[in-house]
Regions:
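Phosphate/ATP-binding catalytic cores across multiple sugar-kinase/actin-like superfamilies
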Residues: 194-197, 201, 302-322
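Glycine-rich phosphate-binding loops at beta-strand->alpha-helix junctions
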Residues: 325-348
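Conserved phosphate-binding catalytic cores of ATP/NTP-utilizing and phosphoryl-transfer enzymes
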Residues: 2-7, 130-146, 187-208
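Glycine-rich phosphate-binding loop of actin/hexokinase-like ATP-binding domains
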Residues: 158-259
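Short beta-strand-loop/turn "lid" adjacent to the catalytic site in phosphate-handling enzymes
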Residues: 80-130, 149-151, 157-168
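Glycine-rich phosphate-binding/hydrolytic loop that grips phosphoryl groups
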Residues: 339, 356, 360-400
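A mobile "lid/hinge" subdomain adjacent to the ATP/sugar-phosphate binding pocket shared
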Residues: 260-304
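Short glycine-rich, Thr/Ser-proximal phosphate-binding strand/loop in the N-terminal lobe
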Residues: 19-67
Length: 400
């Protein structure tokens, strides 16, 4: 296979859901085209459609419907070739599959081989929601794009660092070893990007806290630009509540639910049917804020618990670091929600943080400091997880 060793590499980034497939094609860090296959109901039957999104933001619905999602990879390859994005002169250099899975193996990035599938089988029990889709995506990619390296991108790699001070659980060593347990963390691609972007923007401080607030939510504390503490653990369920996750709860509740519902259903309940959705009936923070403003008690309770969770974790990490010099907000809620940022920072004035009349981020600047002049900085910095994964995949291929 021809490779782009000395020119911009071309990568296909996969996002395999339980009933959807997204294919994002990148030339270097620039997304040139994406395809999104999703299911719809039509005359009582499930059909699958595909939307093409081009670099200029224009969208086109493919004039075709399919009976199964299994055709997505074959159809995606045909569409990319027809559009001229992939051909003999512009071959794919690699296919990237993000893996949200625990264990030492998945704390690093790997070119897929037989060992990868063995390791996926090991973590299926602790991650029944993500692993099946990931496994399906990898198998379809290797079959459809024969000869192209498929790379599993760890969602904890950037957090796997000797600077971490919170990787252990207080469990018997033999149990930890047998089940390969640890506080691996998640959202690593976002934090990895931030660890490069913050100093690049000249914003690095001694003690910083980065709040990744999106559909999933986590917080990581950085000391000298390296991870010291992170809120997620063996799985993304530990830590903050989020759109559909409980966040940390009494483990006995998890055990009880597992006994009553079965382990897989209990894990699904705590990951997909809890959090903001369970409390407020919506997993959309905008709807929850609107509901709280209209005196909807459930929405107000959900919003308050969410804010208290973030503030509490910031306080915990600040205490562990002996202070905090700057706070960063990123991901969808962190970047876009002025009410969320305001509610959080209003509780942190005792730490030296105050917001001015918060402004929406001017993306042309690359970041915004939304703090008062006499406050420690509060930055809003857009994340770019794909850019980080592409960088790390390129390094892996160059060094193989």
């Amino acid at each position: 296979m021809v490779t782009n060793s000395n020119i911009t590499k071309i990568f296909l980034v996969l996002n395999s859901g339980s009933s959807s497939e997204k294919f994002s094609l990148y030339e270097g860090e620039d997304e040139v085209c994406s395809l999104y296959f999703e299911g719809i109901e039509e005359a009582g039957k499930k059909k699958f459609i595909c939307t093409i999104t081009r670099a200029d933001g224009s969208e086109e619905l493919v004039n075709k419907k399919w009976d199964s999602l299994d055709v997505a990879f074959k159809e995606a390859k045909a569409i990319f070739e027809k559009e001229g994005f992939i051909n003999d002169a512009h071959p794919l250099d690699g296919i990237l599959v993000r893996v949200v899975a625990a264990g030492k193996y998945f704390s690093a990035n790997h070119i897929v081989d037989e060992q990868t599938f063995k390791e996926l089988e090991k973590v299926r029990v602790t991650n029944p929601l993500h692993v099946p889709g990931t496994e399906r995506g990898i198998k379809n990619a290797t079959e459809t794009f024969a000869g192209v390296p498929v790379i599993v991108m760890s969602d904890s790699e950037a957090l796997t660092n000797e600077s971490r001070r919170d990787t252990a659980y207080a469990l018997p060593k033999e149990i930890v070893s047998e089940f390969d347990l640890g506080r691996w963390g998640a959202h690593g691609a976002s934090y990895g990007y931030m660890m490069g972007r913050i100093p690049e923007l000249g914003l690095l401080e001694k003690k910083m806290i980065v709040c990744h607030l999106g559909s999933g939510c986590s917080i990581t504390a950085l000391v000298d630009g390296k991870p010291a503490y992170t809120s997620m653990g063996e799985t993304p369920l530990e830590g903050l509540m989020s759109s559909t996750r409980t966040g940390s709860i009494d483990p006995t509740i998890g055990a009880l639910l597992g006994e009553k519902l079965g382990a897989a259903e209990a894990i699904k309940l705590m990951n997909k049917q809890s959090g903001l959705l369970a409390m407020a009936g919506s997993n959309d923070m905008r709807e929850i804020i609107a509901g709280a403003e209209e005196d909807n008690e459930d929405a107000a309770a959900a919003f308050d618990l969410f804010i208290d969770g973030v503030v509490g974790k910031i306080g915990e990490f600040a205490a562990k670091m002996g202070g905090v010099d700057a706070i960063v907000f990123t991901a969808t809620i962190g970047e876009r929600s002025i009410p969320v940022r305001s509610a959080i920072i209003s509780k942190l004035e005792f730490m030296g943080f105050k917001l001015k009349n918060d402004i929406k981020l001017d993306k042309s600047a690359g970041y915004a400091n939304v703090a008062e002049d006499d406050s420690k900085p509060v930055y809003v910095i857009p994340t770019n997880e794909a850019a980080y994964m592409i960088k790390k995949a390129g390094e892996l291929l160059d060094n193989k």
